[in-house]
Design a protein with these regions (language model features):
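Short, flexible helix-loop junctions that flank or precede catalytic/ligand sites
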Residues: 1-378
Length: 378
């Protein structure tokens, strides 16, 4: 396969993925090209790719510098925007001595908080003058999309300087009421460390720093919040509690009391997200858990009593907080998701089942009683 053929082949696959509203394209040796739609991977060709195919396809979407970096490090992250097709985040890697790629769709239209259907309290969080807001979720849970919607809201509703440090830049934000500076690691700066070190010299109001991966990145995030900036970041975890545990475990035992004090003073919000298949089969809906740093939450963080936070969240919906199970109950009650999917994604299956049994109007509906639903409340 020649480079021109490889470029056309990739573009045809990307067009197909876009036409099916797919989220990811998988290129791997000894397996046909495949796309993920609504969380399910589907082959799009009967013919497996050879190792030579995957190598040629990867090189076809890379610049010469990226090819050299990939050969040296065996990893490469970048974004591409083939004309008339869209924008995609690319991760190239080696697995079992062979080249593989995953190409993720980045919508060209910026998402909005209203359009995503996420809680309105995120608008308030996004407009905070200072503090740390961390978006939590597994890979593919929509963290980057929600974060882009939050940045766009701030861009439209304030006047300041927003800086993003990303690897790679995903959503491209135009200047609206804010100046938006987007820096890509490897393209606009040599490293995360160099970019983050110099960020405070660029007079920012909001700093989006991508993923918190280690202690050093976490230290930068806290420092940005302490110096009067709003810092937005992501973290791989399944819930607010798990995220706090993971952050604490970044640090050695002797550093943790200081960390807990810093978090208690500077954390603004912890937003956890999961994508649940919609009942009508048309896409997925976001179930969002929100922890806001109220005085009571702050005190629990300071003391290290992280395990007690979820109970406070359950009782603080009037303040804008909610747990995953409360979000799932609301989505089920609104006929957005099925009973099975609600329970499948619950933090506490028994608690959610009981909540639906006792409080759900949908569960008491005639349709359910007549057996037209394919589940039973027990």
């Amino acid at each position: 396969m020649e480079r021109d053929q490889a470029s056309k082949f990739i573009n045809d696959l990307l067009k197909l993925m876009v036409s099916r509203n797919g989220s990811d394209l998988f290129i791997t040796a000894e397996f046909p090209p495949a796309i993920k739609v609504d969380g399910k991977v589907t082959k799009v060709s009967p013919q497996p790719l050879t190792p030579n195919h995957t190598l040629t396809l990867a090189r076809a979407v890379m610049s010469d510098k990226q090819v050299a970096d990939f050969e040296r490090t065996k990893e490469c992250n970048f974004a591409i925007s083939p004309a008339g097709i869209g924008r995609f985040r690319v991760n190239a890697f080696i697995q079992q001595g062979r080249v593989g790629m995953v190409m993720r769709t980045i919508p060209l239209t910026l998402p909005t908080i209203d359009g995503l259907g996420v809680p309105q309290v995120l608008k308030e969080v996004t407009m905070a003058k200072r503090g740390l807001c961390i978006l939590v979720g597994a890979t593919g849970s929509g963290k980057s999309t929600t974060l882009a919607a939050m940045v766009d809201w701030r861009n439209e509703n304030s006047f300041g300087h927003i800086i993003t440090v990303e690897d790679p830049v995903e959503f491209v934000h135009p200047h609206k009421n804010c100046v938006v500076t987007q820096r890509e690691v490897g393209l606009d700066t040599d490293s995360w460390e160099a970019a983050l070190k110099n960020t405070l010299r660029q007079a920012p109001d909001v700093i989006l720093m991508g993923e918190i991966r280690d202690r050093e990145t976490m230290e930068h995030a806290v420092a940005f919040a302490e110096t009067g900036h709003l810092c937005l970041a992501t973290l791989h975890a399944n819930s607010a509690n798990q995220a706090l545990d993971r952050i604490i475990n970044f640090f050695p035992e002797e550093r943790r009391p200081q960390l807990l004090m810093d978090l208690s003073l500077n954390l603004r919000a912890m937003v956890s997200q999961r994508l649940i298949p919609k009942q009508d089969g048309k896409g997925r809906a976001a179930a969002v858990e929100i922890m806001l740093n109220t005085p009571l939450i702050s005190d629990l963080i300071f003391k290290g009593d992280v395990h007690e936070i979820k109970e406070i969240m359950k009782k603080s919906r009037n303040l804008g907080m909610q747990t995953f199970d409360q979000a799932l109950f609301d989505a089920y009650e609104a006929n957005v998701i099925s009973y099975e999917d609600a329970l499948r994604n619950a933090d506490s299956l028994n608690d959610l089942r009981l909540q639906i049994k006792l409080n759900s109007q949908r569960a008491k509906s005639p349709d359910l009683a007549s057996g037209t639903e394919h589940f039973a409340i027990v």
